[in-house]
């Protein structure tokens, strides 16, 4: 039988989808080459309302395909499944299986049971059954991998539904994490992202407050690992020893995603974020003093209940001061069951939209100005997989700088995902850069692995097509 997994939401879900694919293939399922398959798995997100709406809209489209015989079974997992449970069957009785965030490994058995009994099956666990990293995995990338160091979250942010769906923080032992990274590197992986809901509280379960900084140093020392990243930290628990470890460990990339959410102390207090703007700015200042070329990115929520124009101006002022390389900006979305959803002074949508547009305009200007500083500089890129299959043979590629910036460039030599290329930047836009023809190329074992997994006709691969310079 064939399968496909559609993923909504955050990096946690992307990594969970790799595990879902792994347990299915371990049972003999084969990945479909299209969006249609015998089994369609939807790995859902519950963080914002628009994710809910998109999911239920897609379920309606799948009904027609199921009636036409193009799909045999539909399974729904992830945070929305954990939250809505029986509601999914009420809204979409054609769904066959609903499973939660804590029991990914149960999916094959639930699918078998549903086929045998010709009934819908639901299994939601309220506690972690098996740590996801102990399950089989099917990774899409030959050069980059997620490695989970913890699951769950002990914070109580008033806008966030994740702790109630993912549970309290559970930490993996350092030895297990390092062993997984070593195994990945032996398979050709060059880049690892350490993944957790709040990575810098890693170690809380075994009482070691310096555990995350120590983990960075030990992981970065693994021979063959060229790039090491992590996401996401929390400003309240972020400490100097992590910045020191980033500075001292060559493999750790000069990039830091530090969620702000708001620049207003009053709103941060209402969000129950446990830090204030001054603490945030102190972290940024220390990071830049110790790692001058570091790129800082962030998350910002616009329109939190009770946000005044003065509060919003505090956010704009902080954004202008910090000058983020990029920012994930969101309009506040009330989630049922969270304290913020029942707070007074919910902000009208037109005001939220107007503020959101102003923030986006400011951040885009800053991102463009920061990117323009790179024009004329030479940067080393990790070649990544592009999205335009019709331009895979025209010697145009895409890659990421150590700071995480996206660069489109040309190369007269054949490149594979996982190879490295050095280019000179000739053009900048807010969200990407353009490089001249590659100056040097470094082929890697990761590129060799890509060749082994792909036929030679597509081996010239990775171009997106060069954006026009306007």
UniProtKB/Swiss-Prot annotation:
Pfam assignment, any one: UPF0004
Molecular function terms, GO-annotated: 4 iron, 4 sulfur cluster binding; metal ion binding; N6-isopentenyladenosine methylthiotransferase activity
Top-rank EC class of the record's enzyme: transferase
Catalytic reaction(s) noted: N(6)-dimethylallyladenosine(37) in tRNA + (sulfur carrier)-SH + AH2 + 2 S-adenosyl-L-methionine = 2-methylsulfanyl-N(6)-dimethylallyladenosine(37) in tRNA + (sulfur carrier)-H + 5'-deoxyadenosine + L-methionine + A + S-adenosyl-L-homocysteine + 2 H(+)
Superkingdom assignment: Bacteria
Complex and partners: Monomer.
Protein name: tRNA-2-methylthio-N(6)-dimethylallyladenosine synthase
Organism expressing this protein natively: Tropheryma whipplei (strain TW08/27) (Whipple's bacillus)
């Amino acid at each position: 039988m064939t399968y496909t997994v559609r993923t909504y939401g955050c990096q946690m879900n992307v990594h969970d989808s790799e595990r879902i694919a792994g347990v299915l293939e371990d049972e003999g399922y084969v990945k479909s080459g299209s969006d249609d398959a015998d089994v369609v798995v939807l790995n859902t997100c519950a963080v914002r309302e628009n994710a809910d709406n998109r999911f239920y809209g897609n379920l309606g489209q799948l009904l027609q395909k199921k009636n036409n015989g193009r799909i045999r079974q539909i399974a729904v997992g992830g945070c929305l499944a954990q939250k809505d449970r029986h509601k999914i069957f009420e809204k979409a009785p054609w769904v066959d299986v609903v499973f939660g965030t804590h029991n990914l490994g149960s999916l094959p058995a639930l699918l078998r049971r549903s086929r045998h009994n010709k009934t819908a099956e639901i299994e939601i666990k309220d506690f972690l059954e098996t740590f996801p990293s102990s399950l089989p995995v099917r990774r899409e990338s030959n050069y980059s991998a997620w490695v989970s160091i913890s699951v769950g979250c002990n914070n109580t942010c008033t806008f966030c539904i994740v702790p109630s769906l993912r549970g309290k923080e559970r930490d993996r032992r350092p030895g297990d994490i390092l062993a997984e990274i070593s195994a990945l590197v032996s398979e050709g992986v060059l880049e690892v992202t350490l993944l957790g809901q709040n990575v810098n509280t890693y170690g809380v379960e075994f009482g070691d407050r310096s555990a995350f900084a120590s983990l960075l140093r030990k992981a970065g020392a693994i021979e063959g690992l060229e790039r090491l990243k992590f996401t996401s930290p929390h400003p309240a628990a972020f400490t100097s020893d992590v910045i020191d470890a980033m500075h001292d460990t060559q493999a750790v990339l000069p990039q830091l995603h530090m969620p702000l959410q708001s620049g207003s102390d009053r709103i941060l207090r209402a969000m129950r974020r446990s830090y204030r703007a001054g603490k945030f700015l102190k972290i940024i200042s220390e990071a830049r003093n110790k790692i001058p070329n570091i790129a800082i990115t962030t998350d910002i929520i616009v329109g939190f209940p009770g946000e005044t124009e003065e509060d919003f101006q505090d956010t704009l002022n902080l954004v202008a001061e910090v000058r983020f390389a990029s920012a994930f900006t969101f309009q506040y979305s009330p989630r049922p069951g969270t304290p913020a959803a029942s707070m007074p002074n919910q902000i009208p949508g037109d005001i939220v939209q107007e503020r959101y547009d102003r923030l986006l305009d400011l951040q885009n200007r800053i991102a463009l100005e920061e990117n323009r500083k790179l024009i004329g500089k030479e940067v080393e890129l990790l070649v990544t997989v592009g999205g335009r299959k019709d331009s895979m043979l025209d010697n145009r590629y895409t890659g990421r700088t150590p700071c995480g910036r996206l660069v489109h460039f040309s190369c007269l030599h054949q490149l594979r995902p996982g190879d490295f290329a050095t280019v000179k930047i000739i053009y900048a836009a807010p969200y990407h850069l353009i490089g001249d023809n590659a100056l040097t190329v470094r082929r890697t074992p990761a590129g060799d692995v890509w060749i082994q997994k792909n036929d030679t006709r597509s081996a010239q691969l990775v171009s997106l097509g060069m954006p026009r310079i306007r």
